[in-house]
């Protein structure tokens, strides 16, 4: 091996310990492996891991950030590039590939020479093999879900069969639904289920264009795995499910009979996840019909715009809604439930109010909240512990942690019983009764008796999980021998402290870990006794927390202890299996217990957030979707106001039917338009999740969907420009939104020419007003769009019925210095000036550049450099731009342009060749140009 050592985080990379013969044998094996561009393959060499070929290059570039980490294994003629990976770096790589990325899979091989075998494999949707590594030191905050899809056409209508698998919660689900060409329902399902991986048949019907579906999967950050169509089979499905589903098979047959297209995907999932190959799955799964209409629909654009999920570049956790609301969730099961709730906001007013009632109970009773929080902190992740019990390699640790968690039930029950507020009936039915049922049926008593009888709980202080020595005489003998050795070790501890003139435990500690029994002292104490240490003791390790050392007596005693403990472990092995098996029979009860506690955990976190902010959150009034308005007084963006050094300026939002249901918001860049429309979406989502909201007062009409077109970025990797991405997202809104949705659109049309952008923006506004009729916040730099609020003639009566209102973000220009000051207040009325040049000044552009910009603006747009203040807006708005076209020209021209766009969109391009499309487009353009002869606004496009 050649090349300089690379030292990530201050330590050298592990050295390759292969001789020439071993290297040649491995190279021979490695080159025979089948090619898989997605697979990252790592090889376990006991003390370290290695990666080879393209995988080594990937790891060097992605994780070490230098190619100097690469080594050549073997001769230059047939050798392969390689990289060594420490155990700590292996955990980092595994977490990144399986929990953060969606373009790789992970494979782990064990063996030596040319004899290696695949022992673990994982994908973002199936992490089971690596769970112990991934979550050894971290909570599991999300439940990875695999989904399988099967698109099919019936009578010219596209349908999609969907099945999902949640291996963490042992749940299967099915759904099928009609779909549009943009696969908007699939996107909503992928978001709501939190999918990490999607199975798709590689050879679908040729009449179905899968490109939009693949784009949806990519936009949702989901790994696409193509399988043969033959894998999507439903033969013997009921029989197979009968082995893994709890209860009778008859309800399963009845459920399957309701589906035509979802059965194939379900069969593909069973095969792909190999559920039938693991007998620990038998009788442990549930299956359900998944209904897309149970929750608010969110697409990937809305998730990004509202910052729902944590991002890789987030500086702190408050950058995302999940990070902010996860402030006091204590364990993984609560965090996973919060993650699911944020992607599945409720639609039922009663369900929303039930959650709000419980949050209010905790908000109003600090002692109740604090008491529960202290108990919840002492509870482990019950879902994962129950999952661990089902593994064939399960040991006593999950049994003990379940026992310790369940021991908190009487305390939680007692705290809840003390609450006698206005929501006591709800608290009793939701939390107290399930806990009392657990206690009344003596489930806790039976499990506790098992653990207390079978396990030596006194040894937990030493970090050991032992079967009680009372179980057998052999264990009793070994326990006595261990006690004798322990006494010798403790006596040696005292003698050593005396020899070094140190106090026992305070200055000289006795520890037991991977190094066996060792002594530890601080670096400061080590300097005082260094001479004595040099003569009679052996220093094992020096770290920040102190110096670990031993001597011959301690080493011999430690070796004796380890040997006896090994015998004890072997002797208790059968009993351990029995205890784990019996504990596993309580799994269903544990799962119900976990569901109660995780919901309690999340609602507690909501209450903590509502009361701990500088300005407390308020309870929103919730009305049905066909009633009420959306009124947010003094609303704030929860994530922005939580940032250090931010003094957030609140704003009112009044989306009132017939008055201001559709709002056009103008004003300078950086003035707060984007923040305002996003915070409205965030407040609505938080309310429907069941949380208090950052407002002074809030009334919210339930929305079935939030659509967002905010800040489209380039997607060059997918061959999609900023403008095309903007149009694709807008197309999803036009096709998927209803009058019960909430739409937020920011700066539509800025990715193309001014005239094209304005024409599109006008036509889209008209469509949303006339057809969709949903509450809409439309932030724009096209000030001419404000004319839409004044069209009250008979021809546009349907627009005035919805209620169109103009708002602007305030700005002040000093008349003398011409300096711009952002006020960040949203106020009634239109802003008819662009502040682009002022913003450039604000950003300290060179004076010469600003002067030239003003000159060109004056030439091209007849820009007035002298401020002219209108009576209603005064100096908060600024100078006006001369209108070149009359409102009538704009209205008629935009209507004709919209007709052109609708006709063009209706062309069946999938059925036409290029020459025919060009012929039709040329004719349509000629007709439009003819109509433009008497319309100055339309003429500008030619």
From Swiss-Prot:
It is found in: Nucleus. Pfam families: MutS_I, MutS_II, MutS_III, MutS_IV, MutS_V. CDD domains: ABC_MSH2_euk. It comes from the Eukaryota. ATP binds at residues 667-674. GO terms for biological process: mismatch repair; mitotic recombination. GO terms for molecular function: ATP binding; ATP-dependent DNA damage sensor activity; mismatched DNA binding. Keywords: ATP-binding, DNA damage, DNA repair, DNA-binding, Nucleotide-binding, Nucleus. GO terms for cellular component: MutSalpha complex; nucleus. InterPro entries: DNA_mismatch_repair_Msh2, DNA_mismatch_repair_MutS-lik_N, DNA_mismatch_repair_MutS_C, DNA_mismatch_repair_MutS_clamp, DNA_mismatch_repair_MutS_core, DNA_mismatch_repair_MutS_N, DNA_mismatch_repair_MutS_sf, DNA_mmatch_repair_MutS_con_dom. The keyword DNA damage applies. Gene3D superfamilies: 1.10.1420.10, DNA repair protein MutS, domain I (3.40.1170.10), MutS, connector domain (3.30.420.110), P-loop containing nucleotide triphosphate hydrolases (3.40.50.300). Involved in postreplication mismatch repair. Binds specifically to DNA containing mismatched nucleotides thus providing a target for the excision repair processes characteristic of postreplication mismatch repair. Belongs to the DNA mismatch repair MutS family. Heterodimer of MSH2 and MSH6 (GTBP). This is DNA mismatch repair protein MSH2. It comes from Zea mays (Maize).
């Amino acid at each position: 091996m050649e090349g300089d050592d690379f030292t990530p985080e201050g330590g050298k990379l592990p050295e390759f310990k292969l001789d020439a013969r071993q290297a040649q044998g491995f190279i021979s094996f490695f080159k025979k492996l089948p090619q898989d561009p997605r697979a990252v393959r790592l090889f376990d060499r006991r003390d370290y891991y290695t990666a080879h070929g393209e995988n080594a290059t990937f790891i060097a570039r992605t994780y070490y950030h230098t190619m100097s980490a690469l080594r050549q294994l073997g001769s230059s003629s047939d050798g392969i590039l390689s990289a060594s990976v420490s155990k700590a770096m292996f955990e980092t790589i595994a977490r990144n590939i399986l929990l953060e990325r969606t373009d790789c899979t992970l494979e782990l091989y064990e063996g030596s020479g040319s004899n290696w075998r695949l022992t673990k494999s994982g994908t973002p949707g199936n992490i089971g093999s690596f769970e112990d590594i991934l979550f050894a030191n971290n909570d599991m905050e999300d439940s990875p879900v695999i989904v399988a899809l099967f698109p099919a056409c019936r009578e010219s209508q596209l349908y999609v069969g969907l099945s999902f698998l949640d291996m963490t919660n042992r749940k299967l689900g099915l759904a099928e639904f009609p779909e549009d060409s943009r696969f908007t329902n699939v996107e909503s399902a992928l978001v709501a289920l939190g999918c990490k991986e999607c199975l798709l048949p590689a050879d679908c019907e040729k009449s179905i264009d899968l490109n939009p579906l693949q784009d949806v999967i990519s936009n949702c950050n989901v790994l696409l795995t193509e399988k043969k169509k033959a894998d999507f089979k439903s033969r013997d499905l009921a029989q197979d499910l009968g082995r893994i589903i709890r209860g009778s098979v008859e309800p399963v047959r009845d459920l399957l009979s309701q589906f035509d297209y979802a059965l194939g995907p379900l069969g593909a999932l069973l095969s792909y996840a190999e559920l039938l190959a693991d007998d620990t799955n038998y009788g442990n799964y549930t299956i359900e019909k998944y209904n897309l209409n149970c929750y608010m629909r969110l697409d990937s654009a809305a998730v990004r715009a509202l910052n729902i999920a944590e991002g890789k570049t987030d500086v702190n956790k408050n950058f995302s809604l999940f990070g902010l609301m996860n402030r006091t969730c204590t364990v993984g099961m609560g965090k996973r439930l919060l993650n699911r709730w944020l992607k599945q906001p409720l639609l039922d007013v009663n369900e929303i109010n039930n959650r709000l009632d419980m949050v209010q109970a905790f908000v109003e009773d600090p002692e109740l909240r604090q008491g529960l929080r202290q108990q919840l902190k002492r509870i482990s992740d019950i879902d994962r512990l129950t999952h661990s019990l089902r593994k064939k390699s399960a040991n006593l640790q999950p049994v003990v942690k379940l026992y310790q968690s369940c021991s908190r039930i009487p305390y939680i029950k007692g705290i809840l019983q003390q609450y006698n507020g206005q929501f006591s009936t709800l608290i009793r039915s939701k939390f107290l009764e399930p806990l009392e049922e657990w206690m009344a049926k003596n489930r806790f008593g039976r499990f506790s008796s098992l653990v207390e009888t079978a396990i030596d709980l006194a040894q937990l202080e030493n970090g050991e999980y032992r079967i009680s020595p009372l179980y057998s005489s052999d264990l009793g003998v070994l326990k006595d021998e261990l006690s004798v050795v322990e006494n010798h070790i403790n006596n040696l501890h005292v003698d050593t402290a005396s020899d070094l003139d140190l106090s026992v435990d305070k200055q000289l500690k006795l520890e037991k870990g991977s190094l066996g029994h060792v002594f530890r002292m601080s670096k400061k104490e080590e300097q005082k006794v260094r001479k004595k240490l040099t003569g009679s003791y052996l220093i094992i390790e020096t770290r920040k927390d102190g110096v670990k050392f031993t001597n011959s007596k301690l080493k011999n005693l430690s070796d004796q202890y380890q040997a006896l403990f090994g015998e004890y472990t072997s002797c208790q092995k059968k009993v351990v299996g029995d205890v784990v098996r019996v504990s596993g029979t309580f799994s269903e009860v544990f799962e119900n217990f976990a569901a109660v506690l995780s919901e309690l955990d999340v609602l507690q976190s909501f209450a903590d957030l509502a009361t701990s902010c500088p300005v407390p959150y308020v309870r929103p009034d919730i009305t049905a979707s066909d009633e009420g308005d959306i009124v947010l007084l003094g609303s704030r963006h929860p994530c922005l106001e939580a940032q250090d050094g931010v003094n957030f300026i609140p704003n009112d939002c009044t989306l009132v039917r017939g008055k201001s249901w559709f709002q056009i918001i103008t004003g300078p860049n950086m003035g707060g338009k984007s923040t305002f429309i996003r915070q409205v979406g965030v407040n609505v989502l938080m309310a429907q999740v069941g949380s208090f909201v950052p407002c002074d007062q809030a009334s919210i009409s339930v929305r079935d969907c939030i659509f967002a077109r905010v800040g489209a970025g380039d997607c060059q990797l997918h061959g999609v420009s900023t403008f095309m991405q903007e149009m694709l997202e807008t197309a999803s809104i036009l096709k998927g939104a209803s009058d019960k949705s909430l739409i937020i659109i920011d700066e539509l049309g800025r990715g193309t020419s001014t005239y094209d952008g304005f024409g599109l923006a006008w036509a889209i506004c008209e469509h949303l007003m006339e057809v969709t009729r949903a509450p809409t916040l439309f932030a724009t730099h096209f000030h001419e769009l404000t004319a839409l609020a004044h069209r009250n003639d008979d021809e546009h009566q349907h627009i005035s019925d919805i209620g169109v209102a103009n708002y602007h973000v305030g700005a002040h220009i000093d008349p003398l210095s011409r300096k711009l000051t952002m006020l960040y207040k949203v106020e009634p009325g239109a802003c008819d000036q662009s502040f682009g040049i002022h913003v450039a000044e604000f950003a300290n552009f060179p004076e010469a550049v600003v002067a030239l910009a003003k000159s060109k603006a004056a030439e091209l747009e007849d820009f007035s450099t002298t401020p002219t203040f209108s009576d209603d807006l005064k100096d908060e708005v600024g100078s006006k731009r001369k209108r070149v076209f009359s409102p009538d020209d704009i209205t008629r021209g935009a209507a004709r342009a919209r007709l052109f766009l609708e006709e063009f969109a209706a062309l069946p391009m999938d059925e036409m060749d290029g020459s025919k499309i060009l012929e039709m487009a040329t004719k349509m353009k000629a007709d439009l140009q003819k109509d433009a002869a008497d319309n100055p606004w339309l003429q500008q496009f030619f």
